[in-house]
């Protein structure tokens, strides 16, 4: 199956310039807005100096497409994590092509993802060292909270899909995908903005990373479904995602006093830029 991507550059890009890159992904039909879930704004990011790779993941494997039921399809797709491996392979090819244009700084790349795209983020952080920062609109497929947060019927459902939970061989099964099991090697700042209807599914990951001093931040949005629908929340997600990537990839902040508490937290995180390195969006130093 095929996949494709669009590379969006800043409107004032000139040949020879290199820009930090943000991946926006899951599906892309060529209408470049904010990716699946519409949470990471492509054109505003480009307008702030980012290269943005809008990536459309490949469809299911040939084995999965011959399935005659949803359960059979998902089990085939999950066998040896074949779907995750295929998506990662396609993403890496798209990134190679983007870097070959000469417009991307390969040492400053971030990834975002929502729903299945969040799982793509997980896999990429564990199985590659391509990215320096991540943003997720939902979190996370892992061993403990994910199968239990929605109750026993959901636990039975994910087991029927081929996942292993609370049984012999669980850790071996989850090793390539579990952020919990890979906390010692995943050292990337992670922003999570999720609805109150499903945030419990990632609490095991969030507690593990917080307890270990990793750079992680969770926002829970009230009265939200899987796809966020409230205009105020959608605007806040747009702004926070943009500022998160600017902070970690550009050493740049929004110097509006209303943002001071946000940047105080972020500056105290592991690996954060120092105050000497930070500049306001208008280019002014924070120092006198």
PLM region spans:
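Structural recognition of the beta-strand scaffold that forms the well-ordered cores
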Residues: 21-25, 51-55, 108-113, 133-137, ...
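Short, solvent-exposed loop/turn and secondary-structure capping segments
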Residues: 17-18, 32-37, 63-67, 123, ...
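Cap/lid segment of the alpha/beta-hydrolase catalytic domain
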Residues: 1-101, 105-107, 114
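Alpha/beta-hydrolase-fold serine-hydrolase catalytic core, especially in secreted/extracellular enzymes
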Residues: 188-189, 200-203, 210-216, 222-288
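Serine-hydrolase catalytic core
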Residues: 126-129, 172-224
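Mobile cap/lid helix-loop segments that gate and shape the active-site cleft of serine hydrolases
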Residues: 29, 70-71, 78, 133, ...
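Short beta-to-alpha linker loops that shape the active-site pocket of alpha/beta-hydrolase fold enzymes
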Residues: 56-60, 140, 222-224
């Amino acid at each position: 199956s095929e996949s494709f991507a669009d590379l969006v550059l800043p409107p004032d890009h000139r040949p020879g310039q290199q820009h930090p890159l943000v991946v926006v992904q899951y599906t892309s039909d060529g209408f470049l807005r904010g990716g699946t879930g519409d949470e990471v704004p492509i054109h505003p990011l480009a307008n702030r100096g980012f290269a943005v790779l809008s990536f459309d993941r490949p469809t299911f494997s040939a084995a999965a497409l011959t399935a005659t039921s949803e359960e059979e399809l998902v089990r085939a797709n999950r066998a040896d994590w074949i779907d995750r491996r295929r998506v990662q392979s396609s993403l890496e090819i798209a990134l190679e092509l983007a870097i070959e244009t000469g417009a991307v700084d390969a040492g400053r790349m971030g990834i975002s993802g929502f729903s299945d795209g969040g799982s793509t983020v997980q896999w990429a952080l564990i199985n590659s060292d391509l990215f320096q920062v991540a943003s997720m609109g939902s979190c996370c497929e892992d061993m403990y909270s994910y199968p239990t947060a929605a109750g026993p019927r959901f636990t039975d459902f994910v087991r029927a899909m081929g996942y292993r939970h609370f049984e012999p061989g669980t850790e071996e099964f989850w090793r390539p995908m579990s952020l919990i099991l890979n906390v010692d090697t995943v050292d990337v700042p992670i922003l999570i903005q999720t609805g109150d209807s499903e945030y419990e599914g990632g609490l095991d990951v969030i507690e593990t990373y917080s307890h270990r001093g990793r750079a992680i931040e969770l926002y829970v949005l009230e009265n939200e479904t899987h796809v966020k629908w409230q205009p105020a929340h959608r605007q806040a997600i747009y702004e926070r995602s943009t500022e998160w990537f600017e902070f970690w990839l550009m050493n740049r902040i929004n110097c509006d006093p209303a943002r001071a508490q946000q940047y105080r937290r972020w500056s105290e995180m592991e690996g954060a830029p120092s105050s000497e390195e930070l500049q306001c969006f208008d280019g002014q130093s924070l120092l006198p």
